[in-house]
Amino acid sequence: MARRAGFSLLAVTVFVVSAAGFAWHNIQSRITWFDIDSILSENDRPGTKPPDSYDGRAVNLLVLGTDSRAGDNNVDGSQGDDEVSVARSDTALVVHISADRKRIDAVSIPRDTLVDIPSCKTLDGNSTGAEEDGQFNSAFANGAGSGSDKKAVASGAACTLKTVEKMTNIRIDDFIVIDFNGLSKVVDSLGGVHVQVDEAIDDPDYTGFKLDEGCQKLDGQAALQYARVRHGVGDGSDISRISRQQKLMSAMASKALSSNVLTQSGFLTSTLETLTTSERIGQIGNLSGLAYSVQGVGIDKINFITMPNEAAADENRVIPTEGAKKVWKALEQDKPVSADAAAPATTDAPATADDSATSEEQNAEDAGVEPAATQAPATQSPKAGASPQQPATKPTASACPA
């Protein structure tokens, strides 16, 4: 039987809960959740349609990875100074689960994207100032302030949620935050994961991380370094790092879903203790119910997509393109997003065409997104620091052994 190897870390989290009904009461106490409705102004948010339930409607989740490197999180050679010791969001995904539970799209938002960040309330009663053309991951930092505890993380997630809604006009139902130190523990609880490394990594100046090209087995610390590294590989951009993070997520999900770890208390504990969530999805019954509802999603109906973007005037920043608007509109309307149309070709070797090309072009047409074949080629190369966006990743069985 084919394994659903392409689920993101979100999907791993969802599925472990559905496998753990026998331990609900014990597990519930391990998830930290906050009610952020009190600090989100309903007047400033896109509308939602009743009933206020996951049943029978599309679900939009914001999944964030935090990047505090203080204390136990400082496992990759960084110094844990003020710049990295406070809570920061290094990874952001808008995960759309279709109303019919037959399709999942996960859209990565580059942290260096320039966006308008609204004023945000925090759980400690303060408010932050609005920013025009702020760096996307500053939204999380604004909400979290100088803190790195769970309450600061929840406030950071709330401000990021408001920023995403302002940029996309999509109502975000819930958030899930996964800390990077937790990522290391989850990989270790899996016994490590295999990743196909396309280009050797050598970062002597910043983290000291080295990784050879080819199929490599990563333990928790190596996986964390692989997910974080920007120097000593490729063009050093956040866009190329997103591609590596997506590959690692798929490898983790593949390992979890192809073994019996989903029912092992060590894996459940290490996974769930890494989470900070909004109130509804932090309740085991709701999380488990969502898990059961997506069990029938086919491997060919799960897409990782990088938000279409281009270089900004500042060569170290990117801005959303018109293609990004089409992607967000497709999700808002609960329509398929063409993998090819969502993100043009990169400098990597192109994927081989398959029999689904015609149907994907039709899906793109339905979603209001032009198929890749009709898009005009770029007239110039991207500026330094802003690599071409990565194509959507179709989950496939890895040639790297599990």
In which residue ranges do the predicted regions lie?
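Non-catalytic, solvent-exposed segments at the cell envelope interface
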Residues: 1-402
